[in-house]
């Protein structure tokens, strides 16, 4: 395979014209037809992107501009969110409610930390778009560097159906709980998706305590959190408001056991964030006995 990527130039001149072998040309065409970018192919040969584009043009391949690439519709299940009638659809709707960017031009974008990149693959698999590429970027906040993974998909049908379910552009201050869009028996999956996207679970150990105490928090609009609070049977807890964002925090290992058992009810790997699931598993390992009380809808 190493010989495949070895470049031969005319007269062995480092700046001379590249003499491509038939195998190299076939490889380039095959990679491009399988939706690999010209930049990615060029990096394999250590040549410029334009060199790859020239090979494609000379072999009658249509080379798309960056604008055209952004608009291309690769095969996917565009009807995925048409009806929320399964655990996976409820989960991903909740996740996009919390952590998805929905553009006016038909774009869905999800940004996650690099450590959660596998979660993007789970979403792509859910909508039958595993061929779509995951991109990477670096974000700087308060002099701290964050490495991110993200996907960007353009699909007007997906975006329209999401909008019909209340997941809209600039949603952070106007989201309402989709009581008429998500069946009651799927609430746990929707809330888990929302929790994975815009919630936290962590622990702290008081000085005299033998075991760590856990707490979970949800963040969002007042309407969203009031509905989540009611479903979790925690109407006695107050919401906190800071910079137009509300939060709901629940502490105490005993009550968290019942809440987390509801959130993770009938969950499985494809519809849960692995990192948070591991924290929940550690929490269960530290609990001793006791049956969790019932929360959620009957």
Model regions and ranges:
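Internal intein/HINT superfamily modules and their associated LAGLIDADG
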Residues: 2-298
